[in-house]
Design a protein with these regions (language model features):
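Conserved C-terminal beta-signal and adjacent last beta-strands/turns
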Residues: 6-8, 19, 317, 321, ...
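Structural signature of Gram-negative outer-membrane beta-barrels, strongest in the C-terminal barrel
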Residues: 214-216, 338-340, 345-350, 365, ...
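Acidic, small-polar-rich N-terminal luminal/periplasmic segments of exported/outer-membrane proteins
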Residues: 21-153, 542
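Outer-membrane beta-barrel translocator/receptor signature
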Residues: 118-120, 131-209, 215-221, 269, ...
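Acidic/polar loop-and-plug regions of large Gram-negative outer-membrane beta-barrel proteins
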Residues: 191, 195, 210-278, 284, ...
Length: 719
């Protein structure tokens, strides 16, 4: 049925366009807006045989976006996952990911909430495609294009804002001329985080100096260093009711954690350098080197089970990751009479050290305990929250040992659950041709060869009589080498210069060490078998794109995706949740740009059907229908008003017979006041109707409560 609807819409739209105008010309667009910078080489959106969304720095400010999840809410075909309250997590066309993030085309896969202060634009590519990015990206990816120093320009700006939750932020951006061939730019931000939930708070600091050096007319060097220091409360949400299969609204104000026990920190140092050299009129060489060092910790309590008679079964852990990566990428781009040829090489060397401690409750000598849900819960004293109505294992204790008034304490340093050291070495070679077959026909043809060698050393853990785990030597290091070839084909027909019809086929893969490289075998295993071969995804897409003379851009796409190689796997970390044999099909419609001089629109709609060919039940975290609308009316030169709406259909949290996230509609509003050319005041009212909604959940009893109504006032000054 979806195929029929899509093809009908495509035929009707195309016919109407031809009837309206047969000789339209492409209007010029602002810098970056009409190109996808994550692609090599950058190409106009019209000539990309793939669905994508581009959000510029101005879009981010207008809509008051503060993090990646805000952008996703207004992006069709993509929805957010909870990320356990400490990381960006996105579901790209049914595939959950915590690692498919890039900065200037370079992998950025550590788990954290990314800031937007130094972003020129964000590019969201949908559909698995390993050709240009390698492993991962099985459902899509997000690339942030950074602000860089600009030669020959001097400018500076200040952006600051506060909101009714009590949060605030300041960002500064300054570019200066060092001499005729050198420029320096500095971006800095400080955020104080707050929201509608008790105890939530946080701070983010980011500093990003960049330098551009024009060595000669044909050679440019860009240098960048970024420091990030983040800390925030971790909120895992509320439980669901087994009878109603829905979140318990009466608990929407209860936080199952405390500031001391639920927290995450991140410290990162990222150094990047790139060289661009035009060695001829038709040849260009790009070399980039990135070295980074991340220190990430998160610890949290969460509800692992709940019934009204029992109470809330609390569980938790503390997880520490230390990761260092060196990424070297080299590409050579040559233009010919009939197209462009890109040859690229990439080398990645990553060292990852991780350990995880379970929570340890003194009363149960285990990692779980039962408490009665109340506001301002306390997990370290006998405060009436501890209950003897237990149905779980009590670590050798009897019910008589556990009384209503018993004292308990919890710690994160007594019970070691796992520890591993991982080394990943990736060598990649790719080739892509953008070929003009005829005046109206273009083809993209290419492939990528990846060799991924993963060595993991799992440490032995022994549990003593008190239920505490400790190191007990090391298991033998296990090495898995995967060699894969990933093809890509795109065929584009352009009936006129500002219009394209396309077909594309691509593949992507995910090694079985997972996104975060912690393990690819069960703890008891000492060898690696073919069972742990990479998961492979196939993606096909049929689409239509049209840039109208008025400034509007229309895109229609019908897509299918299939997980062709997969085996059941659970690494026990709570981070890797895989759908086995996932099959999706759906369509997407977007309409963006200027309606006329005074009105602009950003509309997107996606419908996705998802099934599992292996196992039973519906695929989780995949709402069948999502749509968003952002409409801006420029009433006068000084005043503009915008209205936004987002809708997300109901979706299964885990399995078809389990709890559901209910559908919801959220309304937003913004007013922009421009008293002068260099001053802008914005007032954003988020969740205008104060809707109670639940955007995502990590598991059955960890449902996030959407933000209540919030008013944000921001001010931008250009100097």
């Amino acid at each position: 049925m979806k195929k029929i609807v899509f093809l009908f819409a495509l035929v009707v739209t195309t016919s109407a366009i031809y009837a309206q105008d047969e000789t339209l010309e492409v209007k010029g667009k602002v810098l970056y807006k009409d190109q996808v910078n994550s692609l090599k080489p950058p190409v106009p959106i019209l000539n990309v045989p793939q669905s994508l969304s581009v959000i510029t720095d101005e879009d981010i400010k207008l809509q008051g976006f503060r993090q990646i999840g805000d952008l996703i809410r207004y992006t069709p075909g993509v929805n957010t996952s909870q990320g356990e309250g400490h990381r960006d997590a996105v579901v790209f066309r049914g595939v959950r990911s915590t690692a498919d993030f890039y900065q200037d085309g370079v992998r950025d896969d550590v788990q954290y909430y990314r800031s937007l202060y130094n972003v020129e634009q964000v590019e969201i590519l949908k559909g698995g495609d390993a050709l240009l990015f390698g492993r991962g990206g099985t459902g899509g990816l997000i690339n942030r294009v950074s602000k860089t120093a600009q030669i020959g320009e001097t400018f500076s700006s200040l952006d600051t804002g506060i909101d009714s939750f009590g949060g605030g932020d300041v960002a500064m951006d300054g570019n200066m001329i060092v001499n005729d061939n050198v420029a320096f730019r500095l971006n800095v931000h400080v955020d104080s985080l707050a929201n509608h939930r008790d105890m939530f708070s946080g701070d983010r600091v980011g500093v990003n100096p960049t330098m551009k050096i024009q060595v000669d007319p044909a050679t440019t060097i860009d240098l960048s260093y970024e420091y990030a220091d983040h800390e925030r409360f971790v909120d895992r949400g509320i439980p669901t009711d087994d009878a109603t299969k829905s979140p318990i609204e009466a608990m929407k104000d209860i936080v199952f954690g405390t500031k001391d026990l639920n927290t995450t920190t991140l410290e990162a140092n990222i150094l990047k350098g790139s060289l661009n050299h035009n060695y001829s009129d038709t040849g260009k060489l790009n070399l980039s080197v990135t070295a980074n060092d991340f220190r990430k910790m998160y610890q949290n309590l969460y509800v692992s089970d709940y019934t009204a008679s029992m109470g809330a079964k609390m569980d938790g852990y503390r997880d520490v990751t230390m990761r260092e990566s060196l990424i070297i990428a080299l590409s050579n781009i040559n233009e010919f009479d009939r197209g462009t040829l890109t040859v690229g090489f990439e080398m990645v060397d990553t060292e990852n050290n991780n350990h995880r401690y379970n929570t340890y409750f003194s009363s149960t000598r285990d990692d779980n305990e039962i408490f009665m849900p109340v506001r301002n819960m306390n997990f370290n004293v006998a405060n009436g929250n501890l209950t003897n109505r237990r149905t779980l294992e009590t670590g050798g204790l009897t019910d008589a040992d556990v009384t209503q008034d018993q004292v308990t304490y919890v710690d994160y340093i007594s019970d070691l659950n796992n520890q591993s050291d991982t080394d990943i070495e990736v060598t990649s070679l790719y080739l892509q041709g953008n070929i003009d077959l005829a005046d109206q026909w273009k083809m993209i043809l290419g492939g990528r060869y990846d060799e991924v060698e993963t060595t993991i050393k799992q440490y032995g853990i022994t549990v003593d009589g008190t239920g505490k785990g400790a190191l007990n030597g090391t298991n033998p290091s296990l090495t898995k080498k995967d060699s894969l070839f990933s093809p890509r084909l795109g065929l584009i027909f352009k009936p006129q210069e500002n219009m394209s019809l396309y077909f594309s086929y691509s593949e992507a893969f995910q090694p079985r060490s997972g996104e975060q490289y912690k393990t690819f075998v069960d703890k008891a295993k000492t060898t690696v078998s073919s069972k742990y071969n990479p998961d492979v995804f196939e993606n096909t897409e049929l689409g239509f794109k049209y840039d109208m003379d008025s400034g509007l851009s229309l895109a229609l796409a019908y897509f299918t995706g299939e997980q062709t190689k997969a085996t059941a796997f659970d690494n026990g970390t709570g981070e890797e949740t895989r759908e086995i044999g996932l099959e999706i099909d759906g369509f997407e419609i977007t309409l963006n740009g200027q309606v006329n001089d005074n009105n602009a629109i950003r509309f997107g709609l996606a419908s996705v059907d998802a099934t599992k060919s292996k196992g039973s039940g519906a695929a989780k975290e995949i709402p069948e229908l999502t749509y968003s609308l952002w409409y801006t009316h420029q009433a006068t030169d000084m005043f503009a008003i915008s209205f936004g709406a987002t809708y997300q259909d109901e979706s299964y949290i885990n399995a078809e017979s389990g709890p559901l996230l209910p559908d919801y509609t959220r309304l937003d509003m913004a007013m922009t006041i421009t008293p002068s050319e260099n001053d802008v005041v914005r007032i954003n009212i988020e969740n205008l109707g104060d809707e109670t909604y639940y955007p995502h959940s990590h598991s059955d009893h960890q449902v996030s409560v959407g933000e209540s109504q919030n008013v944000r006032v921001s001010y931008s000054k250009r100097f």
